[in-house]
Each structure stands twice: as C-alpha cells, then as structure tokens.
Amino acid sequence: MAFEFKLPDIGEGIHEGEIVKWFVKPNDEVDEDDVLAEVQNDKAVVEIPSPVKGKVLELKVEEGTVATVGQTIITFDAPGYEDLQFKGSDESDDAKTEAQVQSTAEAGQDVAKEEQAQEPAKATGAGQQDQAEVDPNKRVIAMPSVRKYAREKGVDIRKVTGSGNNGRVVKEDIDSFVNGGAQEAAPQETAAPQETAAKPAAAPAPEGEFPETREKMSGIRKAIAKAMVNSKHTAPHVTLMDEVDVTNLVAHRKQFKQVAADQGIKLTYLPYVVKALTSALKKFPVLNTSIDDKTDEVIQKHYFNIGIAADTEKGLLVPVVKNADRKSVFEISDEINGLATKAREGKLAPAEMKGASCTITNIGSAGGQWFTPVINHPEVAILGIGRIAEKAIVRDGEIVAAPVLALSLSFDHRMIDGATAQNALNHIKRLLNDPQLILMEA
C-alpha cells in the first residue's frame, strides 16, 4: 500500500498553501526529513520535509497550485511506513504532522540528514546508550526541530530512547541523554536539493475580441486583499500630507555612510525615520494603541515595534523591527536590510511579521511623493514617506534649493484627532530636519 502524505497543519491558523516548488520528482529516493517542497502561505515560505524513507510515486499537486490542509500532495512507496497514517488519535492528533514542518527563516538552512556512519565512543555516564548496539538503519520519530536540537547538542538521535507517543523523541529526551554524558556526534551532511519536477505546459494564448485569462489569487495576495478591505471598512482613514527640509539629514547620512560601511552596514534614510516615528509614539501614546473591535476596549502598547512595508515580487510583506527604541540607527539599518533581503527571498518567518506598533511604507523608492497609505489594522496609524526632491524653499528670507522629503500620515479617526496627528507629524518633521535631535530625544 502506498503511503499518502497530506499537507500538514503548519500553524498560524493557515488552512491552505501554494506549492511553490517541488524538490523531488517521481522515482526519486528520499530519506526522512529530506525537503520535499516549499509551500507559501500568507505568512511565509515553509519547507515541507519527508516523514518517511522511500521512493516517490506521484506528485498529486502541481507547482503553483493551492492545496488545503489534509489534502494528499504526494505518495510514496515506503515499506514499513504504511501504518504511520493509521496510528490513531494519539499520534495524529498530538503531532498531526505539523511537527514535521519547519519555517525556512527559523531554521536558516535546509533540514539536514543524520550521519549514517558513526564511530563508537566510550560511555561516560549512566544515561549513555551502548554505542555498539546502534542500528544505522533505525527509524526515529522526531520533529525536525528536535533533530536540529540534537545536532546542536552533538547527539546522534538514533541513540536516544524516545519517551513520547509511539516512541517519539522529544527535547527532554535529548537533554536527559546529554546529562548522561553523550559524546559528540560526527558532522552532519546537508541534504542536497534534488531536481525539480517538470513544470506544466503554458496555457494557450487567449483569443477572441476581448481576450482574457483567469488565475487563482496567491495566498499572499488574498491575505493582502482581505487585510486592506478589513482596514478600510473598519477604520475611518484620514491622511495628512506634509514635507520637510532634510538638508541636515542628507549631510548627516553622508558623514556617517562610510563609517557604517566599514562595519558592513548600508546606511539609508529609513532608520532615521524609524527613530523619529518611535519618538513620536512615545510623545503621543495614542498613536501606539489599537482598538479591540469585539470588546470596544482601547489597547495601549508599551513596546515600540516598527513595521517596514517591503515590496516583493509576490506582494507586500511587513517585517517588524522589534524594540526600535532600544536600538541605534546603525543597528536598525542593518536589521532593515536583513529583513528586506529575507522578504524578497520569501524567507521571512511568521514571528518576524508580528507585533508591530506602527508601520512605515516607502513610496519614495518607486519615485512617488504624497499618497494615502492604508493602515495596517489593528494599528491606528501608518507613516508614508515619499522621495527626496530638490525644491525651492524660503530660508532666512531667501529662496534657496534644498532637498525636501514628502510625508503622508494616515490615522484612524476613531482614536486620533486631527490636531494630535498633525502635532505628531510636526514632531517627526522636527527630528528629520535636525537629526542631532534624534540622538537627544529618540
């Protein structure tokens, strides 16, 4: 009987995912924990590892297709594993295959296989298993995170006796084994990605007087659409548009750009804006709130996490700079660059897109100026930044050319009054006009 592997519950309340890429094809041989596919939901790209060792029989879902949790996505010829899917509630409900899923951003690398060849080592404690009795072909039931934890601790997981359901190895088993005096395991081998399955043939060109095509919305695009509609239907938006002379800011960045580069950091204007917005959230706490629409309660946030909207090929993602009030401009700049790279590569972990106090969105990178950004509900404000353009301004009674930054602040009028929003925007402008104040006040 073939082993049918169903799309597992990957948490975060996600019930479906798009098969972005298959790393295996029919007739490929796979081991436990070899990466089978990348699945993209509205939170992140997730790697799906194999729960069995065997041969791939059939890919049930093509690349680019959305599969639902519980749907069979691949079948294996896996002798000895056929009963794994019929173990009953103890196994399926407790682990529910979600234990076999690992976020690419959380892991930071592909799931690795355990080294098959190990040299016997001397036992040094009561908890040590007899090294000579280890079966190199022993099948181990364990979460990828537990396997990774075992590798980090230098433990050959095949030597550990599992205490979980059906002999599943848990972290506590690894700790007990280590406390018993385990020797370091041999270096691991990284599972090499296998050839991808052939892509389906391109759809025929549309014909007729008004040619059209239809395609399913991606998981990320559906999530964006739902969030935008919910925000506009829930929060009465008002947008203030202003501009600020950033002559001193441009000079300050130029002065410290090389200092940052010497530390491997690309210094942009965005971290200055993050610090200015953080200062505004402190000075005007109403901007750092949200409304519980079910209980009609106001939630005051006592943390300062700034979301940074990032434009990617697959849609808009919002990674979050945590505790921006405790970080320097250099630290924030480095973190933003790292998060932006992850966003473009589709490797953001769900945890890296949670917990924002307020969000910044940058239309200036696309050459825009003023716009009406949509609030990232349940936040109550969003700061939009446009391009820096040379403009004629009046300074000391004279008309001079100066770099001017366009700013747009959208706010939820249920929580924030217009004057309060303008005062907050004025505070941001003051700090960006004189970046020395960021050191003093932000």
Curated annotation (Swiss-Prot):
Residues 141-178 form the Peripheral subunit-binding (PSBD) domain. Residues 2-77 form the Lipoyl-binding domain. CDD domains: lipoyl_domain. Its EC number is 2.3.1.12. GO terms for molecular function: dihydrolipoyllysine-residue acetyltransferase activity; dihydrolipoyllysine-residue succinyltransferase activity. Residues 84-136, 182-215 are annotated as: Disordered. PROSITE patterns: BIOTINYL_LIPOYL (PS50968), LIPOYL (PS00189), PSBD (PS51826). It is an enzyme of class 2 (transferase). One of its GO terms (cellular component) is cytosol. The pyruvate dehydrogenase complex catalyzes the overall conversion of pyruvate to acetyl-CoA and CO(2). It contains multiple copies of three enzymatic components: pyruvate dehydrogenase (E1), dihydrolipoamide acetyltransferase (E2) and lipoamide dehydrogenase (E3). The B.subtilis PDH complex also possesses branched-chain 2-oxoacid dehydrogenase (BCDH) activity. Forms a 24-polypeptide structural core with octahedral symmetry. This is Dihydrolipoyllysine-residue acetyltransferase component of pyruvate dehydrogenase complex. It comes from Bacillus subtilis (strain 168).
